[in-house]
Amino acid sequence: MTGLEKLKKSKRLIQSSFSDLRRYSGWSGIRRGQDPEVLAAAILKDFHRVEKGLTLPAPRAWFGKDVVERLVGTCQAYSLLPHFDERILGSAVAALTEYGSSFQDAPPVWWKQIEANLADLRLRFDSCNTESGGSRELGELAHQRSPETGQAFSDFIRSRSSVRNFSERMVDDALLEAAVVDAQHSPSVCNRQSSRVRYFARGDAANRLLQLQNGNRGFGSTASHVALVTGDLRSFLTSGERNQVFIDGGLFSMNLVHGLLARGVGTCCLNWSVDAPQDAKLRRALNLPPHEVVIMMIALGYPEIAARVTHSPKIATDRVLMKAPDGNALSWT
């Protein structure tokens, strides 16, 4: 590689990194503390912290004073907006209600001072939590896993291969939605659920999307649908979370793929590893909101009967599973 080539690559890296910085700085919660979606993310984050505390083996009585006080205040501010998500408020109220009834010790002064505000929120939103916040029993099923269950899961996971030969049969909208519901159960930082997905059925719109991605030549246009997975930067509140959208989006995408696979639908993940100018082309084509970032595309459809897939052998497990020399060390020197 010549010096000029290195310089050009470095320039592209700097330009794209600056673009990422500007987008995260401008649209995350760092500078948009009163944005409705940022407030919603703050509520999700804090009431999940309350939930986590309630699941500990022996929660400290009236733990998390600062978090609880902040959560009640944020819920009040959010509830005064013209538009808000009642489910989020209902779940937060449910978590706070369980918190308030979880301890034998007498309530402290600070809790008594916010009880009136919580009572008002409970009166307005307690009926809105279709999926209650707080905690629940893990359930017997989690303790009844067997070697057979583990083997079935291993067989399922290992059966997945990227499909690049799709039949003409279209995937039903109800099935696509069911796979999204499954993917919604993916882990996300403090349950903030930043991932979004759009489906594009086979046709002009899907083809325009695929033309912007360089890994689908020869098969992309035959897919029943193309999924575009994105992440909402307004769900992230600190500089330390600047990469979290891609972590959560990757987990969501994998579970979306597995949800489709479980229903007989093949997939091929299409990376969106591009520089800022190419990303801008997609944004213009879709009029993508500036607070969303692209995670990946997924070509999907029913495999052709005679479809072939790659072997894609995996590297040795001992290159992936890193074991400490003495089994109990922090350093792998």
Model segments located where?
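Acidic, surface-exposed loops and disordered segments
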Residues: 1-333
